[in-house]
From Swiss-Prot:
Pfam families: polyprenyl_synt. Belongs to the FPP/GGPP synthase family. All-trans-hexaprenyl diphosphate binds at residues 93, 170-171, 208. Binds 2 Mg(2+) ions per subunit. Its cofactor is Mg(2+). This is Heptaprenyl diphosphate synthase component 2. PANTHER family: ALL TRANS-POLYPRENYL-DIPHOSPHATE SYNTHASE PDSS1, GERANYLGERANYL PYROPHOSPHATE SYNTHASE. It comes from Geobacillus stearothermophilus (Bacillus stearothermophilus).
């Protein structure tokens, strides 16, 4: 099922969330709001708000409350993108100039911080201390993941568990929190809240692994940035780690560094694609996806459950 068809069930609610996002990024200091709006208008799948809204269907659904949760989670995601672009020295995001490219590195960092603060402000509207604590802890873990990404650049000897821990913090926990907080804010029973949290966690792991695969298999037009950007920026992802076990390409990959030019990198990327690294990466993504789908079987049967399944399958099987 296409993403647009999946979203049709929530189209009016997502439109309301989008309007709330525009209000949330506004600032009395014009340039901050302008930069945040620049990123917001670049678009995106709004995966996290969708998970919030669907998870809330397992409790007492109240759009006015859910808007605050959905906006808070999307703002964290936006903040992490702004910071990532600084870390990776990226000039394009979704086919548009990044904030750091259009303004500056320093301005981008403060814009990211501003979005984190706005996120906490939005969640405070719920008046739910536990939800606020979950959100704050999620921000802490996202920041830890960002620091780990900096430390792990060009570290081709890192074990698989280091990569998995990093993507858990940078990606999976935010999707897990989206599911958890949607259900929590709707007053869903605790066993359902926990089940949705772990569903989101496993979907998030599959999501990031698939994203890392697409960096090698997608086109610049599909990705909104040059293919192979992760490796070019020193980010050691799952396909790279698996390819390092192939002696034919190990030396070439290990030689990659900040001075490697685009032509040399293109040759390394082609070599990686000739190994079984992509297939092995998809296999691990599928394992996480299977765990997520199994958890859905224990949820009450409703339309949201079916859409969560469709969304999980889309995330794990998408080709761009």
């Amino acid at each position: 099922m296409k993403l647009k068809a999946m979203y049709s069930f929530l189209s009016d609610d997502l439109a309301a969330v989008e309007e709330e996002l525009e209000r949330a990024v506004q600032s009395e200091y014009g340039p901050l709001g302008e930069a945040a709006l620049h990123l917001l208008q670049a678009g995106g799948k709004r995966i996290r708000p969708v998970f919030v809204l669907l998870a809330a269907r397992f409790g007492q659904y109240d759009l006015e409350r859910m808007k605050h949760v959905a906006v808070a989670l999307e703002l964290i995601h936006m903040a992490s993108l702004v910071h990532d672009d600084v870390i990776d020295d990226a000039d394009l995001r979704r086919g548009r100039p990044t904030i750091k490219a259009k303004w500056s590195n320093r301005f981008a960092m403060y814009t990211g911080d501003y979005l984190f603060a706005r996120s906490l402000e939005r969640m405070a509207e719920l008046g739910n201390p536990r939800a606020h604590q979950v959100l704050a802890k999620t921000i802490v873990e996202v920041c830890r993941g960002e620091i780990e990404q900096i430390k792990d650049k060009y570290r081709f000897d890192q074990p698989l568990r280091t990569y998995l821990r990093r993507i858990r913090r940078k990606t999976a926990l935010l999707i897990a929190a989206s599911c958890q907080l949607g259900a929590l804010a709707a007053g869903a029973p605790e066993p359902i809240v926990k089940r949705l949290y772990w569903f989101g966690h496993y979907v998030g792991m599959s999501f990031q692994i698939t994203d890392d695969i697409l960096d090698f298999t997608g086109t610049e037009e599909q990705l909104g940035k040059p293919a192979g950007s992760d490796l070019l920026q020193g980010n050691v992802t799952l396909p790279v780690l698996y390819a390092l076990s192939d002696e034919r390409v190990k030396a070439a990959i290990a030689a990659v560094g900040p001075e490697t030019d685009v032509a040399e990198m293109a040759a390394v990327i082609s070599a990686i694609k000739r190994t079984d690294a992509i297939e092995r990466s998809y296999a691990l993504s599928d394992r996480y996806l299977d765990k997520a789908l199994h958890l859905l079987d224990g949820l009450p049967m409703n339309e949201a459950r079916g859409l969560l399944r469709d969304l999980a399958l889309y995330i794990g099987k998408r080709d761009y």
